């Protein structure tokens, strides 16, 4: 039977519930347990797919094509379990489902209320998402006291009571601030946060106390006394120089032992040697490169969370410190390519909308003409094709129909039809809804032998995740290829261009898929690893 660890946060947001939860999950997995994780988001959007990257950050795409919270990316980077659409749901998704059932008459005329109908649906989805895991960690988004979180907190209160104390526990993250003028940490915010939880019927079993200063034993003892939590279950989690230290920090304080004993689980001791190797490679690099990352959401780097982590993983794999130089593509439009000078490689990630696109195209041209290693992802591939059409073929009006529907040479256009993962044919028009209408999830891709991308992966067929509506226009593709554009990857049926490369360039690869979603600190990713190797070669050449 599945055991549940419910994870909540108090005092302030952005305490790192996702990292702490994933780190505990990693330790339990290292003890031989089957672990999964869920994220419950209180916002009313059905999913984050149409939310602004400036507000929400990255949309993480699962293998089965769900657009989810970026915390699921942390989950997959810390544990081996692959997340699905069942591992993340929102208030909007819950209400949408309940209202659809009400319209069908499934409730037989009953008055639909938050309790029991909404809370029952939340509990049903938690149980479904947990599946047959030994332990399921369920993270509740937001902060205790928020009105939006109340149905979720009530649902976990009920579920905790229904399955019993031997199968459910509550881990609460709080902030223990350091007051510089007093020269000490303060426990009062934690006490009040727990008081808020207890007022709605939830007593924490574990407190993870976040701080930027050490929390001494007397403070932990005081917190335990005022919150009715065992002293050994009051965990001090100070800021770390890398998040991949967190599993070791939690293990050193015995958190996994406490969980295993509480649940009565029989399992091995934790083997964290893989994480020790990751931390060692991260903190003791032998080389260093600088990569210019040209994007349009630089005001909130969480919009590129998986990509930034993937570059870190590539550095770990190559024992190389990867310095990312974040450049807003609009700054290139205004200030020119001097911003790119001195970079060992150039990375152009995905994005939507016209703003900043010309700056990305300029960055591609700089990389191609100056033989600087280039990696383009999603839109980064599309702008590479546009740049090639404009500056190699002379089609000065070349563009994507996303930016100019009247372009004389629409080298990138809307995908009007494709088969989804089930084989069903989906169609789209410019008037289609934005939500849930993209080519999403894992798709097979055939790689051309002898290509740079084939050298990276070392295989003929790969599977990568997608999130896009636009593709290279097949009607103009033959002319692009005749002019020297290398198509080194295609969809399984050969209908869609997945990877392009540039002839006579040391390393120029642009892909339509998002390889960052499958990169992990322990395994890295072959494409990013190859990119960093190319950057090292460029630096050594200079």
Curated annotation (Swiss-Prot):
<feature type="domain" description="Glutamine amidotransferase type-1">
    <location>
        <begin position="290"/>
        <end position="541"/>
    </location>
</feature>
<feature type="active site" description="Nucleophile; for glutamine hydrolysis">
    <location>
        <position position="378"/>
    </location>
</feature>
<feature type="binding site">
    <location>
        <position position="13"/>
    </location>
    <ligand>
        <name>CTP</name>
    </ligand>
</feature>
<dbReference type="InterPro" id="IPR027417">
    <property type="entry name" value="P-loop_NTPase"/>
</dbReference>
<feature type="active site">
    <location>
        <position position="516"/>
    </location>
</feature>
<dbReference type="Pfam" id="PF00117">
    <property type="entry name" value="GATase"/>
</dbReference>
<dbReference type="InterPro" id="IPR004468">
    <property type="entry name" value="CTP_synthase"/>
</dbReference>
<feature type="binding site">
    <location>
        <begin position="14"/>
        <end position="19"/>
    </location>
    <ligand>
        <name>ATP</name>
    </ligand>
</feature>
<dbReference type="GO" id="GO:0044210">
    <property type="term" value="P:'de novo' CTP biosynthetic process"/>
</dbReference>
<feature type="binding site">
    <location>
        <begin position="186"/>
        <end position="191"/>
    </location>
    <ligand>
        <name>UTP</name>
    </ligand>
</feature>
<feature type="binding site">
    <location>
        <position position="71"/>
    </location>
    <ligand>
        <name>ATP</name>
    </ligand>
</feature>
<feature type="binding site">
    <location>
        <position position="402"/>
    </location>
    <ligand>
        <name>L-glutamine</name>
    </ligand>
</feature>
<feature type="region of interest" description="Amidoligase domain">
    <location>
        <begin position="1"/>
        <end position="265"/>
    </location>
</feature>
<dbReference type="GO" id="GO:0019856">
    <property type="term" value="P:pyrimidine nucleobase biosynthetic process"/>
</dbReference>
<feature type="binding site">
    <location>
        <begin position="146"/>
        <end position="148"/>
    </location>
    <ligand>
        <name>CTP</name>
    </ligand>
</feature>
<keyword id="KW-0479">Metal-binding</keyword>
<comment type="subunit">
    <text>Homotetramer.</text>
</comment>
<feature type="active site">
    <location>
        <position position="514"/>
    </location>
</feature>
<protein>
    <recommendedName>
        <fullName>CTP synthase</fullName>
        <ecNumber>6.3.4.2</ecNumber>
    </recommendedName>
</protein>
<comment type="pathway">
    <text>Pyrimidine metabolism; CTP biosynthesis via de novo pathway; CTP from UDP: step 2/2.</text>
</comment>
<dbReference type="GO" id="GO:0005524">
    <property type="term" value="F:ATP binding"/>
</dbReference>
<feature type="binding site">
    <location>
        <position position="222"/>
    </location>
    <ligand>
        <name>UTP</name>
    </ligand>
</feature>
<dbReference type="GO" id="GO:0003883">
    <property type="term" value="F:CTP synthase activity"/>
</dbReference>
<comment type="similarity">
    <text>Belongs to the CTP synthase family.</text>
</comment>
<dbReference type="Pfam" id="PF06418">
    <property type="entry name" value="CTP_synth_N"/>
</dbReference>
<dbReference type="GO" id="GO:0004359">
    <property type="term" value="F:glutaminase activity"/>
</dbReference>
<feature type="binding site">
    <location>
        <position position="222"/>
    </location>
    <ligand>
        <name>CTP</name>
    </ligand>
</feature>
<keyword id="KW-0665">Pyrimidine biosynthesis</keyword>
<keyword id="KW-0547">Nucleotide-binding</keyword>
<keyword id="KW-0436">Ligase</keyword>
<feature type="binding site">
    <location>
        <position position="139"/>
    </location>
    <ligand>
        <name>Mg(2+)</name>
    </ligand>
</feature>
<dbReference type="GO" id="GO:0042802">
    <property type="term" value="F:identical protein binding"/>
</dbReference>
<keyword id="KW-0067">ATP-binding</keyword>
<comment type="function">
    <text>Catalyzes the ATP-dependent amination of UTP to CTP with either L-glutamine or ammonia as the source of nitrogen. Regulates intracellular CTP levels through interactions with the four ribonucleotide triphosphates.</text>
</comment>
<feature type="binding site">
    <location>
        <position position="351"/>
    </location>
    <ligand>
        <name>L-glutamine</name>
    </ligand>
</feature>
<keyword id="KW-0460">Magnesium</keyword>
<dbReference type="GO" id="GO:0005829">
    <property type="term" value="C:cytosol"/>
</dbReference>
<dbReference type="InterPro" id="IPR017926">
    <property type="entry name" value="GATASE"/>
</dbReference>
<feature type="binding site">
    <location>
        <position position="469"/>
    </location>
    <ligand>
        <name>L-glutamine</name>
    </ligand>
</feature>
<dbReference type="InterPro" id="IPR017456">
    <property type="entry name" value="CTP_synthase_N"/>
</dbReference>
<feature type="binding site">
    <location>
        <begin position="379"/>
        <end position="382"/>
    </location>
    <ligand>
        <name>L-glutamine</name>
    </ligand>
</feature>
<feature type="binding site">
    <location>
        <position position="71"/>
    </location>
    <ligand>
        <name>Mg(2+)</name>
    </ligand>
</feature>
